[in-house]
């Protein structure tokens, strides 16, 4: 029994040494595992008093048990050795539980004392389960703040541009009305030209409004388009004040030629403001001296296009009408004599050629009758109503006779075919 007790003591000492010799590796392993699942400040605070109380209890128990183990008791036998094994196993389990608790407390203290950069690095490497859900939330919050700021700025810019563009557009509307009134007075002399100028005035105002709205959608390019529109509107106003009131078609032509600049500006926001302003001013200066030439060419083109289209349409309609009338007249000319010929010749063709089953005597008599009827008639125009009546009666009688004979022959043939079938079946 003593030998067994001594062996048991030796094994327990080795276990203690092994447990005391490798605390660092266990702590390092348990740090990573515990940090992944228990990284919370509340949990750390709650664990601190528990760990302190458990450490005090273990410290109280350890000296008592150590004193008991130092005293040799060889006389108690096997039950005493079993009890010692159980108590020492409990000690080893309690020591193992104490070490992870200390490992939990130390990283919590280190995490509180460390910098924010170290926290981020540790969280990225060791705690992905906690880091990844927090990251997108913060980014979304920041993105929402940035989007809201940008949208507020864009709205403010849009409101400023709306306020700036409404005033010149209202001025343009009043001037357009005045020019339209003048053009109505001139329309008594040149109706077509003035009507076209009025249409161009209305289209210019609509296109400018559309270009402003499109610029507001593009954000930063809205500022450039708004400034260009305002500058060009000012140049147009100055030119309108300098020119006489009778030059309304000139104004419309200039505005029409300045519109392509507006349409080309929004898709190029990368060009700086100064270059765009210089290009716009150059284009306006170049279009100003050539206004008369543009006017003449536009008026001629606008007058010739509708006239050409109308003439082409009228010529097409006339040609179609002529062809239709010709076709109708030709068809009527062809159909009129054909109808008369059909009514006159069907009977003779039927009697002579198509009536194969008619006996020869009847055909000869029919031919003789027709010859006798038409012998005295040199033409269709010389016939009278009585002759037409006789022709109708004769044709009707001949048709009836032929029909009766054909029906009788068909019946006879059918009877003969039936008899032949019966005979064939009997045979």
UniProtKB/Swiss-Prot annotation:
Does the keyword Transmembrane belong to this entry?
Answer: no
* Record-level Gene Ontology MF annotations: adenylate cyclase binding; beta-2 adrenergic receptor binding; calmodulin binding; GABA receptor binding; glutamate receptor binding; molecular adaptor activity; protein kinase A binding; protein kinase A regulatory subunit binding
Composition bias type Basic residues, residue spans: 37-48
Q: Which GO terms describe its biological process?
A: adenylate cyclase-inhibiting G protein-coupled receptor signaling pathway; calcineurin-NFAT signaling cascade; chemical synaptic transmission; negative regulation of adenylate cyclase activity; positive regulation of calcineurin-NFAT signaling cascade; positive regulation of calcium ion import across plasma membrane; positive regulation of endosome to plasma membrane protein transport; positive regulation of long-term synaptic potentiation
Q: Where is this motif: AKAP CaM-binding?
A: 76-96
Name where it's found. Postsynaptic recycling endosome membrane; Cell projection, Dendrite; Postsynaptic cell membrane
List lipidated residues, S-palmitoyl cysteine: 36, 129
Q: What is the effect of changing residue 396 to P?
A: Prevents or diminishes RII binding
- Listed PROSITE patterns: AKAP_CAM_BD
Recorded consequence of changing residue 408 to P: Prevents or diminishes RII binding
Where is this chain compositionally biased, Basic and acidic residues type?
8-19, 92-102, 302-333
Q: Where is this region: PKA-RII subunit binding domain?
A: 392-405
Region entry Tethers NFATC2 to CRAC channels, spans: 410-427
Phenotypic consequence of residue 36 to S: Loss of palmitoylation by ZDHHC2
- GO cellular component entries: cytoplasmic side of plasma membrane; cytosol; dendrite; dendrite membrane; dendritic spine; excitatory synapse; membrane raft; plasma membrane
UniProt-annotated stretches for the region Essential to the intracellular anchoring function: 1-170
Per the record, residues carrying Phosphoserine are 22
What is an example of a Pfam family matching this protein? WSK
Q: Report the PTM annotation.
A: Palmitoylated. Palmitoylation at Cys-36 and Cys-129 play a key role in the targeting of AKAP5 to lipid rafts. Palmitoylation by ZDHHC2 is required for AKAP5 function in LTP-stimulated recycling endosome exocytosis.
Q: What is known of its domains?
A: RII-alpha binding site, predicted to form an amphipathic helix, could participate in protein-protein interactions with a complementary surface on the R-subunit dimer.
Q: What is the protein's quaternary organization?
A: Binding protein for dimer of the RII-beta regulatory subunit of cAMP-dependent protein kinase (PKA) and also for the protein kinase C (PKC) and the phosphatase calcineurin (PP2B). Each enzyme is inhibited when bound to the anchoring protein. Also binds the beta2-adrenergic receptor. Part of a complex containing AKAP5, ADCY5, ADCY6 and PDE4C. Interacts with ADCY8, and enhances its phosphorylation at lipid rafts. Interacts with ORAI1 (isoform alpha) (via N-terminus) upon store depletion and in response to LTC4. Does not interact with ORAI2 and ORAI3 paralogs.
Specify the protein name: A-kinase anchor protein 5
Protein's gene: AKAP5
